[in-house]
Amino acid sequence: MANIKSAIKRAELNVKQNEKNSAQKSAMRTAIKAFEANPSEELFRAASSAIDKAETKGLIHKNKASRDKARLSTKLAK
């Protein structure tokens, strides 16, 4: 455990951020799975939005976001 006050604060913040990031990533995955289970335009927009939000917050790389959205759009087109 950290002894210095600033290190203690950073450790607490890291725990909070980890929970927040995990929740955001989980929401993205849930939106993608919902679309894959029942491909529709509405679910595609929701999944695409969730992917964009995760990319903006730095949870996933921009290339992964682009790749994921491209794969979803091909599933929608079929």
Curated annotation (Swiss-Prot):
GO cellular component: cytosol; small ribosomal subunit
GO molecular function: small ribosomal subunit rRNA binding; structural constituent of ribosome
Gene Ontology biological process terms from the UniProt entry: translation
UniProt keyword Ribosomal protein present: yes
Statement: the UniProt record of this protein carries the keyword Kinase: no
Pfam families named among the record's database cross-references: Ribosomal_S20p (PF01649)
Keywords from the UniProt entry: Ribonucleoprotein, Ribosomal protein, RNA-binding, rRNA-binding
Family membership noted in the UniProt record: Belongs to the bacterial ribosomal protein bS20 family.
Function: Binds directly to 16S ribosomal RNA.
Protein name as catalogued: Small ribosomal subunit protein bS20
Gene from which the chain derives: rpsT
